[in-house]
Amino acid sequence: MHKNRLRFLVILILLLSLSSTMFATKALLLYKGSEQGYGYNVQLKYIAPELKKLLIDYDVIDVETDSFKNTSLNDYELVVSCYYTSQMNQAKQYLKSLFDYICQGGKLLIINNIGASIDSSGTNNPGLQELNSVYNLLGVSYTYSWKKSKPIQVSINSEFQADKTLSFEKERDVESYLFIGSNIEPLIQVVAGDNKTYNTAFLSPIGGMIGYNYLLDDNGKVTVNLSRVFGELIYGDWKNYKLLVVGKDNYELRKALDYTLLDYDWTPSLPSVLFGYEAVIYLNDTVELNDAVLNNYMLDGGTVVILSMGSVTRVIKEIEVTNDIFPVPNEFKISWNKSVRFQEQKTSSEILLTSSDNDVLSWKIEIGSGQLIYYPIDLLEKRLRGLFIQTVFSQLPISIQPVINSYSIYLDDFPLPAYNRKIDALTREFGDITDNNFYYNIWWPMMKELAKKFGIKYTTAFVANYNASVTWPFSFQEYINTPEQKKALQELLDGEYEIGVHGYNHIPLTKSNWKEDELAGVLRTFKIFLRNVLNEQYVPYTYVAPNNIIDEFGAKELLKVFPDITSIGTTYKATDTISEFSVIGDKTVVIPRTTSGYYPVQKIISDSVLSIMTLGTFQYFVHPDDVFSTDRNPENKTWKEMYESIQSFISTIQMYYPFLNNHFSSESAEIIYEFLTKKPHISLTDKEMIVSLPLECDFPRYYYLRANKPFTISGGRIVFVSNDLYVIAQLDDVMKIVF
């Protein structure tokens, strides 16, 4: 059992529903009634619950009763025994029954000890030959070597360790088991007082053992992941869909992989075994590969991705992406205008990414039945995380990526106070009007028409004032002076819109701006104001941070006063932790803005598409005053021109990504929370893939899937196809893809 090949299918729950034969999976839990509840309690407290998680049925039987004598072990796929003592009535006969059971395909897990070293009659005791008839089938050889010893060092297989804070200070039993099989995995190894190493827990495809009080630590914590142990024993032919990263830690790469929800290992140096990984991502200064392990991995069909700099340095104005990487609009380009160090393509390599000046930035070359992909590490920036993922995943024989599939459109700073100002940008286009007239008689009606035309939802971010007050008194005179604001609020309340909040004013909720008592006071004041202006039934679920800035202090104070807030809007362009899609508090998610403004259309399209590549989402913000904001309308475009731009943007997104679902921010928050907290488990063989979700997940869940061969789906359906990219909706707890 190679540890990188056989991976436990975390939450293989409901897998039994996929085949009628799997419904028969059943375990037998054995204990001795004479031990006054020892084995019985262990079986019910620790073993049975893990079997239930896997929907494995079980029987619990006292091995010292007639019930056991009348039981056929062959009716069970797994036998788990747990005994404290070594005495057994008719011990040899018991060992022979275990031997016959294993020889006929059964699997045995021994907890504590085999329980039949001595015949309770006092005569006819088993010898090493009888004991090893069972142990040898499990892959070990046993000798009489029992002793008590205080552990000097306890090593637990990291892939099976149930808790990272285990304690082993007390004296414990140890006994020697020599591995004779090539497919045995040590679970727990103990260096005892004699400085010898003892294998006190191990696992093989046929069974295993967790010996002599090493199931629990000194504090009663379970030491090994029993669900995984049982999963490997029963479903051992499967492996996790998993990636390997080799090299120094890289934040952008780690976040890009985290957002895929896929399993990955990260090691500073190359391990000797690579089997079982769908791809190896190698952070290296050079592209030359002289490592035999990597070369053999590629020759056998593996994919190696080299992330490095290179010998060529050029300023890249734009990056061009084709539909071979990801479905993109016609003439799609990513504005970059940065220096990039990259490696010239190798002879006979295939081009993946180019610049607008025809520089080959990323390429791949076939090696044996596998491939080498080169990607310049200078392009591994936050905005381009999704581009890296899609470049790599588009080249794998089979790839799958969970995605959110939800986007929201925000009317930021709306409804907003107005001041009856006559602004040049407005009077030039519309004549003698004020900002009040523009916001509420031109901009808002046209935005409503836009929503009607494209069938989109708006989440607004209401701001009451633009004053700079951070100390008492807190008043709402600006709102009172703008009667149109109250009218618009009521219209939003009565219509199909979501009213989010921006705050009492536009001062970000940070420790540097507010004292704790003043912030608490202004938030309570704003809450009372909302009740007075709207109604008692109105509850804000969305908060958009002014200037997209909030810190942990501000978020904590906000949620104290507004505990129902489920979405906090920031910006993806920032570098702090609150600029990432994440969960804070009990059930609040940070939803950073990925796209904003009306133009350039190519820029807002590329920002959105890059976000769709990364997570299957984008968050789009516009403001009522964008038209006369010098930083947001640097080209002094008219409102008519900007309105045409936003129509072009939305129509393009809907044309090329019709599978994307539009939601209010609060609705999207629920989806993102589920996405971030209820991770699917993805496992596969050469012929099929299983995607299993935790219980009580909301459906559907969505995935990008690529496969180089035909497939069928049960438990899900295809909702979109473009070239070799399939968008899949999972509709059941378990989705099965058969190739």
Task: Report each predicted region and the residues it spans.
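A glycine-rich, often tryptophan-bearing local segment used as a flexible ligand/cofactor-contacting loop or short
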Residues: 87-163, 286-353
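A glycine-centered loop/beta-turn motif at secondary-structure junctions
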Residues: 25-27, 42, 107-108, 163, ...
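Active-site beta->alpha N-cap acidic-glycine motif
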Residues: 380-490, 495
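Surface beta-strand/loop "capping" patches
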Residues: 666-710
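Metal-dependent polysaccharide deacetylase catalytic core of the NodB/CE4 family, i.e.
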Residues: 115-153, 242-247, 298-300, 307-318, ...
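C-terminal beta-strand-rich structural cap/linker in extracellular carbohydrate-active enzymes
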Residues: 288-290, 722-739
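Helical hinge/lid and interdomain linker segments adjacent to catalytic or ligand-binding clefts
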Residues: 29, 36-122, 244-312
